[in-house]
């Protein structure tokens, strides 16, 4: 995490890290590790606490006081009061600052126009909201009037520089000069497949791969010269009809996998490789048909939270080694696989998951490659071998 933050600071003048859930909500909901606060600690990032103050009066003071009491590193440098009227803000601001010795940087009044609806896996994506640009412009106008942007910039400028020790990688990376032709990994990226850790894609490039994006929704074939396939998470269930109608791409992907092309499919990408996706009403939509099984919307949360995946056989990792990831899905499959063992933090609870063979990795978990770079290394090497003609025929894994 420190390494990624340091690398980003070389490119961007300012970084904004958006927290998720509550500030102190970490592993299992009981540990600091993995929380937004923990992230701020390891990256030495000052915190601006945004408090939902709707319907609150003076009670907002002990609420803020509680967060400050937990702030052992004194990282909280200011507070913004969300969904509060201007008239009450002018009353409560001096009281907060006098009692808690914390700067109140401003407020944002509630406006229906600024609300963004959520759904089962979170917020709607920017490209799906017709008036998103106007919403952002209105929000910026409001914030300029009611929040001290200058003070926020000053707080950001006070952040400490992250010093990173140079560590020799245990896994030797492939450089472009070592390859006559670099393997090309085709990455699905459109409205239906949009959940990717950018760090994962950067790591694939570091290990010698080129990346080419394509759309299972709109394109008819994979990028020319593809020797690996990455199908990330997203919302294929929302575009099931369109994916079904793109018969050419479904056949293209099935043929690619059957030819032995290495494939990594996470969550939404895993759903797409099934024979069919069934919606909440049980209606089936035909998918790529690589995996002879159907997946169904269960109408309830099936898995959620951080996990570590332990390798049972040496395909994408060495036996017994682990890689970190997370799960968040309402769908379930007739064939979830059992080639890896998922281990939950805190409780240590385990369960089998993932379908994994020599050149196939697919399942519900979203992986974070930097937690074990060997995964990216293996993936790129498999793509290189495919490019060299190693995988000449498809073996039925299922």
Spell out what each predicted region is.
Residues 1-8, 12:
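Single conserved hydrophobic/aromatic residue that forms the stacking wall/gate
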Residues 14-27:
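Switch II (G3) loop of P-loop NTPases
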Residues 30-37, 65, 245-249:
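Charged helix-capping and loop-helix junction motifs
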Residues 32-53:
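Inter-motif core of Ras-like GTPase G domains
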Residues 40, 179-180, 193-205, 210, ...:
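C-terminal and late-domain segments of enzyme folds
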Residues 57-173:
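Internal gly/pro-rich beta-alpha loop/helix module
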Residues 183-247, 251-256:
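Phosphate-binding active sites in nucleotide-utilizing proteins
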Residues 236-315:
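Cysteine-nucleophile active-site neighborhood
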């Amino acid at each position: 995490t420190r390494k990624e933050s340091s690398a980003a600071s070389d490119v961007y003048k300012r970084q904004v890290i958006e927290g998720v859930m509550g500030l102190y909500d970490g592993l299992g909901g009981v540990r600091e590790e993995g929380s937004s606060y923990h992230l701020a600690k390891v990256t030495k990032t000052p915190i601006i606490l945004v408090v939902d103050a709707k319907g609150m009066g003076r009670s907002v003071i002990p609420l803020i006081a509680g967060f400050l009491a937990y702030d052992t590193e004194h990282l909280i440098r200011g507070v913004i009061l969300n969904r509060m009227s201007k008239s009450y803000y002018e009353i409560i601001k001096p009281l907060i600052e006098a009692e808690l010795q914390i700067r109140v940087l401003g407020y944002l009044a509630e406006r229906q126009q600024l609300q963004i609806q959520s759904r089962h896996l979170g917020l709607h994506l920017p490209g799906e909201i017709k008036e998103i640009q106007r919403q952002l412009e209105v929000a910026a106008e409001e914030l300029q009037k009611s929040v001290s942007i200058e003070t926020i910039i000053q707080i950001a400028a006070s952040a400490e520089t992250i010093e990173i020790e140079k560590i020799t990688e245990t896994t030797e990376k492939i450089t472009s000069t070592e390859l006559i032709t670099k393997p090309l990994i085709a990455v699905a990226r459109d409205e239906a497949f949009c959940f990717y850790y950018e760090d994962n894609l950067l790591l694939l490039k570091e290990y010698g791969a080129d990346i080419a994006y394509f759309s299972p929704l709109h394109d008819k074939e994979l990028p020319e010269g593809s020797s690996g396939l990455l199908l990330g998470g997203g919302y294929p269930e929302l575009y099931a009809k369109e994916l079904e109608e793109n018969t050419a791409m479904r056949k293209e992907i099935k043929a690619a996998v059957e030819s032995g092309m290495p494939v990594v499919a996470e969550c939404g990408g895993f759903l797409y490789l099934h024979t069919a996706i069934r919606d909440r009403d049980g209606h089936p939509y035909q998918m790529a048909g690589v995996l002879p099984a159907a997946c169904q919307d269960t109408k309830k949360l099936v898995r959620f939270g951080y996990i570590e995946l332990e390798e049972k056989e040496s395909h994408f990792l060495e036996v017994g080694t682990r890689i970190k990831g997370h799960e968040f899905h309402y769908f379930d499959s007739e064939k979830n696989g059992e080639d890896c063992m998922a281990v939950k933090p805190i409780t240590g609870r385990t369960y089998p998951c993932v379908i994994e063979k020599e050149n196939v990795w697919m399942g519900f978990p979203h992986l974070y490659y930097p937690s074990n770079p060997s995964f990216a290394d293996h993936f790129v090497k498999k793509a290189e071998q495919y490019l060299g003609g190693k995988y000449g025929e498809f073996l039925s894994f299922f």
